[in-house]
Amino acid sequence: MITTVIEKIFGTKSERDLKKLKPIIEKINSLESEILKLSDEELKQKTFYFKEQLAQGKTLDDILPESFAVVREAARRVIGLRHYDVQLLGGMVLHQGKIAEMRTGEGKTLVATLPSYLNALTGKGVHVVTVNDYLAKRDRNWMGPIHEFLGLSVGYINREMDNEGRQEMYKKDITYVTNNELGFDYLRDNMVVRKEDRVLKKLNYCIVDEVDSILIDEARTPLIISGPAEQSTDKYEVVNRIIPSLKIRKITEDDEIKAKYSGENLSAGYDAVIDEKNHNATLTEDGIAKAEKFLGVANLYNDVESEWVHHINQALRAHHLYEKDVDYVVKDGEVIIVDEFTGRLMPGRRWSDGLHQAVEAKERIKIKEENQTLATITFQNFFKLYSKLSGMTGTAMTEAGEFWQIYKLDVVEVPPNRPSKRVDGADLVYRTEREKYNAIVADIETLWKKGAPVLVGTRSIEKSEKVSAMLRSKGIPHKVLNAKYHEMEAQIISQAGAKGSVTIATNMAGRGTDIVLGGNPATPQQQAEVVELGGLHILGTERHESRRIDNQLRGRAARQGDPGSSRFYISLDDELMRLFANTSRISGILERMGMTEGQVIESRLMSRQIEGAQRMVEGHNFDIRKHLLDYDKVMNQQRTAIYHLRNKILDGESVSEQVMQMIEEVIHETFDKYYNVKHPQSTDFNTLNIFLQRAFTIDANFSGESIKGKSKEQIDGETFEAVKKAFEERSKYFNEQGVNFNEVERMLLLQIIDQAWKQHLYELDQMQKSVSLRGYAQKDPLIEYQKESYNLYQNMLNKVRDVMVEYIFRLQLPPKRRVSPIGTPSSEGGGETSGADTYSNKKIGRNDPCPCGSGKKYKKCCGADL
């Protein structure tokens, strides 16, 4: 209330922020006549002029007005588009490291050329992040010529590109790339064993297109690079056979409310309870007994190693919470996840913790082995690595609080170039889903007969195909855009504004592509006809959990001052209403009002119920993202330290010094463990000598006689000098044999760190699952996680040190083998052999023979602790 009064008097925060930028707009416009007179060559020379200005001490803000004027003119000459004043405002907001909220059709792609050019002048690189490969390529090919005209290099990344191609593209001044490719490239860069294999430069400045989709919607799923775990997949098939025999109860918001007052036990008489709202599945006492009998296990919870309870819970979720053609599709014998916010397929992404395998078992397709995490990071922590971060979207104000709290990003609402003419109709509410879909199809038919273009938004593939089937039965021609037909996404959505077209699209499929009235390209006559019919009509088949996603769907209509309309259709059977609204109360009210079959209702009560349910879900989803971030913050500090250590090793810092420090620490700890300070003569010298000989290959002959008159520190120091000498002799020997010992140390240390980090991630993952139970003991799980993860991290570092010291002294050169150069006959072919002696630097596998020469497998010998 107070905020509203202040805004009426002083204007909104966005209005106040933009008011400060108006003088700069005037300055840019005043330069336009001067810039217009420049020849193409003179305009290109401005880039060199700006770089000289920066070299002489000017700041980016100092050259902003003229640089924006230059980009505006270059865009006009190269692609025939001139930036509006509001687009200049958007460009300045992005340059300030903020989020610009600009409505659909306001030209956000063109806006990004302004700050990307300005910030690329520093030579440190700019990344423009999009949601898919198509948009990255399209935007590079569309906007890239503007930058290239001005002398900057532009590239883009796609998922098929190899390492060399990526390196080349990231060297460009401006690179268009998807959020997933960028994040995975960062993780892969921190797994390489040669610095030449890294692809990214320092993360300087980033512009995130559709910033709400990337930093909010996708933030619930961390990026994970994984490798196969040494576990069998048999249990998934066994457990999958149990599920059909279990009696299931699904509980809703209504059930919980009733049980709260009646004291009813919701699980009584059932084997498992499915909580759709919180996406959980739990076995009851009856279910546990039934599962134990089926598996032949005395106690499910005592058999911790086999994780039967975990497997059963994941199978329950797979069968009752994850729906085919809603949450995933089965394509070419694979389960492919469907992005719940965009409706797009996500090939290559897999649910973790055995859930993906449980879904594969449910669909009776080949179960792929469970993966173990090798590297992981959340989008929250990844994008915070940039020196400056900005973003743009059509819908950000509803999440402004989260953007500030998580990313410290301010949101500024940029006004449209022309006032919106969109008419947003009130929600139409029906009692049942059947009545709702009949009404939707009837309205589509009415609009289609008039020739008005219609875009129907659905939440899932299943619902889009249901509407499609109903339209086919009516003989209404239409196009379907969902994850099954995503290849034609941009083409289908761009024609959604054509006269008489009916397009069905899941969620925000086609986002980033303009819908031009009359079709694309449209003739003036076609455009005028569609304008006369009221423009594009948006019909939403149900409300999304987030108001922001609903606003995105509405925003597809009425771009750049065009006419258009939007309306949502709701039933009490909709997922949002069923799970989060008190539908029994609403249903009772509707019955008392005497609602008949097919009758529609519009009321403030319904609107309040819907908005209340959406706010509840938004709060719930924010808590999930915050929970993920709280735990990842702990890991992030450790990840940063490990990656920093790896980069120091890769970048050529002396590994020998680090190894000598490790050796010294191990020697100190050895004497602390074995040497009896109070009674030196009582020291177990035999054990001490054996350990020193085994660990450091030195002949230690300590005895009560040899240590007389010496302090522990003296003996410690003498031992270190002897070990140091042995180490230097090993180094000399390797080098004499033509093997760079420094490189051996580097490769070895990297492999040990990587193995230890992989194991550490696994232990953190297991520990995070277990600490949640400590809440029952009145302990904060997050604090417990922080304490234990610190201890695990210290143990990991000690393990790296101990294994490195032991390994470096046991490492032996393999027998030399002659290698024939390419093109020369081998000795087996009767010809002479020629070539240099070579040694394999291949990464050691867990099942490979241990290089120390023991004859054992690596995992049973030097790699046993990793």
Swiss-Prot record:
Keyword Amino-acid biosynthesis: no
Region called Disordered, residue ranges: 819-858
Family, similarity comment: Belongs to the SecA family.
Keywords, alphabetical: ATP-binding, Cell inner membrane, Cell membrane, Cytoplasm, Membrane, Metal-binding, Nucleotide-binding, Protein transport, Translocase, Translocation, Transport, Zinc
Gene Ontology biological process terms from the UniProt entry: intracellular protein transmembrane transport; protein import; protein targeting; protein transport by the Sec complex
Organism of provenance: Elusimicrobium minutum (strain Pei191)
Coiled coil (UniProt feature): none
Xref: NCBIfam families: PRK09200.1, PRK12904.1, secA
A molecular-function term among this protein's GO annotations: ATP binding
Residues bound to ATP: 87, 105-109, 514
Gene name for this UniProt entry: secA
Its membrane topology: Peripheral membrane protein
Record HAMAP family: SecA
Primary site of residence: membrane
Cofactor entry: Zn(2+)
PROSITE patterns per record: SECA (PS01312), SECA_MOTOR_DEAD (PS51196)
Pfam families noted in UniProt: P-loop_SecA, SEC-C, SecA_DEAD, SecA_PP_bind, SecA_SW
Reactions mediated catalytically: ATP + H2O + cellular proteinSide 1 = ADP + phosphate + cellular proteinSide 2
Record text on subunit structure and interactions: Monomer and homodimer. Part of the essential Sec protein translocation apparatus which comprises SecA, SecYEG and auxiliary proteins SecDF. Other proteins may also be involved.
Residue positions binding Zn(2+): 850, 852, 861-862
Localization terms from the record: Cell inner membrane; Cytoplasm
Role this protein plays: Part of the Sec protein translocase complex. Interacts with the SecYEG preprotein conducting channel. Has a central role in coupling the hydrolysis of ATP to the transfer of proteins into and across the cell membrane, serving as an ATP-driven molecular motor driving the stepwise translocation of polypeptide chains across the membrane.
Name of this chain's protein: Protein translocase subunit SecA
A GO cellular component entry from the record: cytosol
Cofactor: binding comment: May bind 1 zinc ion per subunit.
Enzyme Commission number: 7.4.2.8
